[in-house]
Amino acid sequence: MTEYKLVVVGAGGVGKSALTIQLIQNHFVDEYDPTIEDSYRKQVVIDGETCLLDILDTAGQEEYSAMRDQYMRTGEGFLCVFAINNSKSFADINLYREQIKRVKDSDDVPMVLVGNKCDLPTRTVDTKQAHELAKSYGIPFIETSAKTRQGVEDAFYTLVREIRQYRMKKLNSSDDGTQGCMGLPCVVM
């Protein structure tokens, strides 16, 4: 069974835990209890493949920012979550993305931009803005509601698909026949 290490990042109060719990336990948590760090595991079938999702739900509060580098190192893919009724959380996405790229030492890291709380009528972040940001990053954008479950599976499953594509790309680029297992050219005698 293939395992995927997913990390949910974003500002405090955007619904990272609510999204994760909705996926794992199929229920909505409406009281706000700031997370320090929680880990969840769930077995799912995505595109006919049985997968084990190892999901790290992270702290959005600034006082826990020192922990970010550590979980960013171990994560394979990132759900970058903002709340559609919180413009500051949308602006913060770039900070998370830049930190992920720095820690991973790569511009090519599987990510999905997630606009949560789409069930709320008080939108301050336009869908078009979010689509444009995602397009500029070269990543998918999905609107979700942890309350109604809209887009929840889609967000996590899309991230798994992004990780699969990334793994295949890495496999193909290292499997071009020019390098042996020690990183040296092979010589047939």
From Swiss-Prot:
Lipidation (S-farnesyl cysteine): C186
Name of encoding gene: NRAS
One term of GO molecular function: protein-containing complex binding
Example GO BP: MAPK cascade
Reported effect, R164A: Loss of GTP-binding activity
Protein location: Cell membrane; Golgi apparatus membrane
Protein family: Belongs to the small GTPase superfamily. Ras family.
Protein name: GTPase NRas
Record-listed GTP binding positions: 10-18, 29-30, 57-61, 116-119
Covalently lipidated residues, kind S-palmitoyl cysteine: C181
Effect on the protein upon substituting Q61K: In CMNS and NCMS; somatic mutation
Consequence of substituting G60E: In NS6; hypermorphic mutation
Gene3D superfamilies assigned: P-loop containing nucleotide triphosphate hydrolases
Native source species: Homo sapiens
Residue ranges, annotated region (Hypervariable region): 166-185
